[in-house]
Amino acid sequence: MWRTLRNAQKMALINQGYRVLGEYKLLEQAELKNIYALPSYASGLHWFGVIFIHSGIYAGSMFRFSILLPDHFPEDVSLPTVIFQTEVFHPHICPVTKSLDLTPCFREWKKDQHHIWHILKYIQTIFSDPEGSVSVTETPSGDTVTLNEVHNREALNLLSKNRMEYIKRVEESIVFSRKHMYDKPPTDDAHYIVFEPYSADRHGKAMEQLKPSNWHNTVDTMATSLPAKCVARIDSARQLHEEEAKQEVPVNRKNLKEKKLTVTANSRRLQNY
């Protein structure tokens, strides 16, 4: 009896491990930009995450966070816990515990509807549109939720009544996050996301491999830039390359059309002869 129970618990842990791996696979397939998360090496129920923000009120910030899944995930209907590493001024983030309120988007966890990438998408949304995140919200399942309470009432009041002061407080969060970007990791977990200042000697070779054909030399400016800005430059260069390719297509088609007309005209001349 005891052995049977132990085997059942072991199988449950194995099944849970596969479900967590499946969540990570779905996250990769979602292809979310500028936000990253992965399970820790020590436990699949503890995820490390980081978000880079390039536009809006929170532009220029980099916030780390952890996602703590319930012990019986995904069967448990209780919501995962999201905790930011540094204090972030936002109506949905508690200034004391640094925890994120997920209830505007999720009433309870439904394993057949909700996935971890939905949490990451929600995190992106609250930073890109803070005003919208505190108004009437629609959950992924289609339910409408009216917000009556938030984790940070002061942030909500400033956002609605004194936007300039709100922005000032947000900028304090941004400066603090950038200042501590390269801090020593609080854990020795092998999967913790670590950043280092750009070094041409150490990272130059890797950057060379990432360069598209029309890459502009920005190594000197990257030395003092955030890693997120480096990624933005890579994305911009890739988009520029794609746009140039699109512009070349109509020209090539036009040339082909002109060549076809020339061949047809020459054929008619030969027939006349």
Swiss-Prot record:
Q: Which domain of life is it from?
A: Eukaryota
Task: Write down the SMART domains for this protein, in alphabetical order.
Answer: UBCc
Question: What InterPro entries has UniProt attached to this entry?
Answer: UBQ-conjugat_E2_core (IPR000608), UBQ-conjugating_enzyme/RWD (IPR016135)
Q: Which residues form the UBC core domain?
A: 15-164
Which family would the database say this protein is a member of? Belongs to the ubiquitin-conjugating enzyme family. FTS subfamily.
Full protein name: Protein crossbronx-like
